């Protein structure tokens, strides 16, 4: 660069030139390469959720990666061996759809985007060890995804079955339950999800439901919100399974309930429309009616079927069951709100004590039998609606008069002894559906042989490589079904002709173990080494968005536990600490009547905004940055104008990391001004220490002590803030110490000044690595600041021998003086009475009483 640090004066700091220089130097020196010769006690694994390579960073990315980078830099200076890697979650529909649109291969599109985004990440000054880079769509990575699938298959944790699945009609692929939003739409395309029956591959996540639920208690460094979301998704229910005999049949129906205390109130049963017993029980006269009913309810999403507000649809099966508790006959219905995949596919209808059952019973005029009443005898208002609270048993034979909670245990014991009930635990969690009918994904390493059935591709034959020369249309069956030369192969067992599996895996399969591959990404023999995993895992700090609370984070927890069961690793949880950073928001201009968004340039009068098309009032609110809302801010534009350090400082300072951040250009300007102020302060202070004429200036010992006190307070506060991930208050402390030191530097000794600016630059470096590196060299150092140790806090330096003594007259503050801390109460009284403030306000009067609060105040009562 033109101006080396040896000839810089107090000119303005030019970030673009300095940042480009140091980024090149860091890369050339391989400064951030991980030291692999480590022991577990001294490792720190700092990890951001890796991005999908869309081709451009957005401010949400910037916030995520800068947070992790600050922590990585800080921990290095604290003496830890830090692993701070980056990679690319590069399989998936967006690349395939982009390739179809542009008539290029997904790999070409992906490689180009990765190159662009890597340059953008480097411009942020991130301390990434690029030697650890992984890309999930590369053969050297997905070979091991296939290997992991094989291990799961060997251990009966991967299987195929015919299932009713969520079908995205736009993307032409299957979605897991977690990928369908609250409105029954695809999480990616937004299409209304349909139901379809297909042969699908599943991973047996339900085998780990109890461990996934129980071990949430270990994750006390995760946000409570995330743990609650996972707990609700796993959905553990403790209750009983009740067996109902069918009248005039040998068949039986089992139903799960958490409210066995209401069993005497069961007045009907409801089956899912695809319950296996229905076709055996229904009269031939009702088959057409049944088919019509099934077609109607198949159009509903699971969420719609479970909704409390929608009217439930049902159909009487024409067959009755026997309530085992009281031997009463009860009708068997089919209901659209019962889902076969949940529980047993049958529910007992207790309309008196369940809101959904009450609505259903009212719609079809079914009996409503109350078996629990409120504790207040005279209160009969409960008879006008469902009563869902605890109470006293009624109409329940020998259990009448007992509290319902106590009756649960007694009725379960009675039912168990009579062989119609047994204790049962169920989970809402369903097995993970990983089949996808698309091209750009990891091939499932299974070969279908007519003789041998499903056969795993041998580990030494992996990877099953995606064919390159393939025509993508985005319509119909999986593109792989068109590659007959790829499909046709030989059975690994018997050698006869066989066919490859044409489904690819859910991209979450690749992203649920990538944090393990980072440890040894160049290992050609194994996906990872157990001994190395033991050193680095679990990840000490994971940073990513709350939107991954159920999908990625739950799948990663499951796969970690599954790999432990397979004997591949020793850990059972992947991430020790989790930070879910808030969204980055910016101002939007929206017509609330049409929901149409406008850019700022389209609004003529910002103070009185109107829709440029209709003249209606415009709503100005902060929303998540988005191209469609015209409120996105390109990180490259900000870096070009202000530099990466300013962008980093703003993104860290504007809000606590877990809160949403509102973008404000004026606040960015404010951070830029602080960067300039920091630059000038350090440069000018350094020049002071080299100014021979200062030898004639009288130094004040108290100013040296004050400077050391200020810098040590900053060390303590910033260290505590970094340990607690409170980056905004850490930067606030930086600003405070610069302001405080600026007032006294002219009166401090050179020794103190050199010490203070050295510490200041060090504690600045995690936040603003470029300017810190430049300043570090400017003040005479040769080794990178990012290889220095974090300064130690000196508690003695912040202790003061004096304090500000407040002088009160009749309880009102009238002045203050500096006083020594070791003065007695009598000395403080004498000192206070002789002050100008006391003499003025006492006006010759004798004090009636003097109250002394040590090290704080003297109150003179007159």
UniProtKB/Swiss-Prot annotation:
Tell me which Pfam families the record gives.
Answer: Anticodon_1, tRNA-synt_1, tRNA-synt_1_2, tRNA-synt_1g
- Cross-referenced SUPFAM superfamilies, in alphabetical order? Anticodon-binding domain of a subclass of class I aminoacyl-tRNA synthetases, Nucleotidylyl transferase, ValRS/IleRS/LeuRS editing domain
Can you say what this protein is called?
Leucine--tRNA ligase
Q: What keywords does the record list, in alphabetical order?
A: Aminoacyl-tRNA synthetase, ATP-binding, Cytoplasm, Ligase, Nucleotide-binding, Protein biosynthesis
Q: Where in the cell is it found?
A: Cytoplasm
What domain of life does the UniProt record list for this protein's source? Bacteria
Top-level EC class: ligase
| Organism the protein comes from | Prochlorococcus marinus (strain NATL2A)
Q: What is its main location?
A: cytoplasm
Q: Name one GO molecular function term.
A: leucine-tRNA ligase activity
Q: Which residues bind ATP?
A: 627
Known CDD domains for this protein?
A: Anticodon_Ia_Leu_BEm (cd07958), LeuRS_core (cd00812)
Motif 'KMSKS' region — list its residue ranges: 624-628
Per the UniProt record, which EC number(s) apply here?
6.1.1.4
Asked whether the UniProt record includes Protein biosynthesis among its keywords, one would answer yes
The entry's family comment says: Belongs to the class-I aminoacyl-tRNA synthetase family.
What cellular component GO annotations does this protein have? cytosol
User: In chain numbering, where does the motif 'HIGH' region fall?
Assistant: 51-61
> Quick one: a GO biological-process term for this protein?
leucyl-tRNA aminoacylation
Q: Which reaction equations make up its catalytic activity?
A: tRNA(Leu) + L-leucine + ATP = L-leucyl-tRNA(Leu) + AMP + diphosphate
């Amino acid at each position: 660069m033109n101006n080396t640090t040896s000839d810089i004066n107090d000119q303005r700091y030019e970030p673009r030139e300095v940042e480009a220089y140091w980024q090149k130097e860091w890369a050339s020196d391989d400064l951030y390469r991980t030291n692999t010769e480590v022991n577990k006690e001294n490792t720190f694994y700092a990890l951001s959720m890796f991005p999908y390579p869309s081709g451009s960073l957005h401010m949400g990315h910037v916030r995520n990666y800068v947070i992790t980078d600050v922590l990585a830099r800080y921990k290095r200076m604290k003496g830890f061996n830090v692993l701070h890697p980056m990679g690319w979650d590069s399989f998936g529909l967006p690349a395939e759809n982009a390739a179809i649109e542009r008539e290029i291969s997904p790999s070409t599109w992906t490689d180009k985007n990765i190159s662009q985004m890597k340059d953008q990440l480097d411009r942020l000054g991130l301390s990434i060890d690029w030697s650890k880079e992984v890309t999930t769509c590369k053969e050297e990575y997905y070979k091991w995804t296939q290997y992991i699938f094989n291990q799961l298959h060997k251990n009966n944790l991967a299987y195929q079955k015919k299932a009713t699945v969520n079908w995205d009609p736009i993307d032409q692929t299957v979605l897991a339950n977690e990928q369908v939003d609250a409105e029954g739409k695809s999480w990616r395309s937004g299409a209304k999800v349909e139901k379809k029956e297909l042969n699908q591959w599943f991973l047996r996540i339900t085998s780990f439901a109890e461990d996934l639920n129980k071990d949430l208690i270990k994750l006390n460094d995760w946000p409570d919100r995330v743990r609650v979301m996972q707990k609700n998704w796993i959905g553990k229910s403790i209750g009983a399974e009740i067996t109902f005999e069918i009248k005039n049949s040998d068949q039986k129906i089992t139903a799960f309930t958490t409210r066995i205390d209401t069993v005497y109130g069961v007045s009907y049963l409801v089956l899912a429309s695809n319950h296996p017993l229905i076709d055996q029980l229904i009269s031939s006269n009702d088959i057409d009616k049944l088919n019509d009913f099934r077609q109607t309810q198949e159009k509903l999403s699971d969420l719609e079927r479970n909704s409390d507000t929608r009217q439930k649809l049902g159909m009487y099966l024409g067959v009755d069951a026997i309530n085992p508790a009281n031997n009463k006959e009860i009708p068997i219905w089919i209901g659209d709100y019962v889902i076969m995949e949940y529980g047993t596919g049958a529910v007992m209808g207790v309309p008196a004590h369940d809101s959904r059952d009450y609505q259903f019973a009212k719609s079809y005029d079914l009996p409503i039998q109350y078996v629990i009443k409120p504790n207040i005898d005279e209160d009969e208002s409960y008879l006008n609606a469902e009563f869902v609270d605890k109470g006293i048993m009624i109409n329940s034979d020998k259990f009448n008069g007992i509290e319902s909670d106590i009756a649960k245990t007694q009725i379960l014991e009675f039912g168990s002894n009579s062989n119609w009930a047994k204790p049962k635990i169920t989970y809402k969690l369903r097995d993970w559906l990983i089949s996808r009918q698309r091209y750009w994904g990891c091939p499932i390493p299974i070969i279908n042989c007519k003789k041998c059935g499903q056969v795993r591709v041998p580990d030494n034959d992996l990877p099953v490589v995606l064919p390159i020369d393939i025509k993508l249309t985005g319509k119909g069956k999986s593109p792989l079904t068109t590659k007959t030369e790829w499909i046709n192969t030989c059975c690994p067992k018997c050698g006869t002709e066989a066919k490859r599996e044409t489904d690819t895996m859910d991209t979450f399969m690749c992203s649920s173990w990538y944090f393990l591959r980072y440890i040894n990404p160049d290992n050609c023999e194994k996906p990872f080494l157990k001994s190395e995993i033991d050193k680095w895992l679990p990840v000490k700090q994971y940073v990513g968005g709350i939107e991954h609370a159920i999908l990625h984070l739950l799948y990663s927890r499951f796969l970690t536990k599954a790999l432990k069961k397979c004997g591949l690793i020793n850990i059972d949880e992947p991430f020790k600490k989790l930070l879910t950073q808030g969204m980055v928001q910016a101002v939007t201009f929206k017509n609330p009547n049409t929901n149409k968004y406008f850019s700022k340039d389209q609004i003529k009068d910002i103070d009185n905004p109107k829709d440029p098309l209709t003249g209606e009032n415009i709503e100005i609110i902060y929303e998540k940055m988005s191209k469609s809302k015209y409120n996105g801010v390109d990180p490259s534009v900000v870096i070009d104008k202000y530099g990466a350090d300013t962008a980093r400082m703003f993104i860290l300072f504007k809000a606590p990391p877990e809160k949403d951040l509102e973008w404000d250009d004026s606040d960015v300007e404010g951070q830029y001004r602080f960067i300039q102020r920091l630059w000038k302060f350090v440069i000018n202070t350094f020049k002071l220490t080299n100014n021979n004429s200062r030898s004639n200036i009288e130094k004040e010992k108290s100013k040296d002590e004050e400077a050391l006190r200020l810098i040590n307070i900053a060390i303590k506060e910033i260290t505590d803030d970094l340990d607690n991930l409170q980056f905004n208050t850490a930067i606030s402390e930086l600003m405070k110490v610069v302001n405080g030191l600026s007032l006294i530097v002219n009166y401090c000794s050179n020794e103190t000044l050199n010490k203070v600016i050295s510490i200041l630059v060090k504690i600045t470096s995690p936040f603003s690595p470029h300017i810190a590196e430049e300043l570090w060299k400017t003040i005479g150092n040769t080794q990178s600041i990012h290889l220095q140790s974090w300064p130690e806090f000196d508690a003695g330096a912040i202790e003061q021998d004096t304090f500000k003594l407040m002088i009160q007259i009749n309880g009102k503050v009238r002045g203050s003086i500096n006083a020594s801390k070791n003065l007695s109460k009598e000395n403080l009284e004498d000192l206070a009475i002789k002050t100008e403030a006391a003499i003025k306000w006492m006006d010759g009067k004798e004090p009636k009483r003097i109250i002394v609060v040590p090290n704080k105040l003297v109150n003179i009562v007159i």
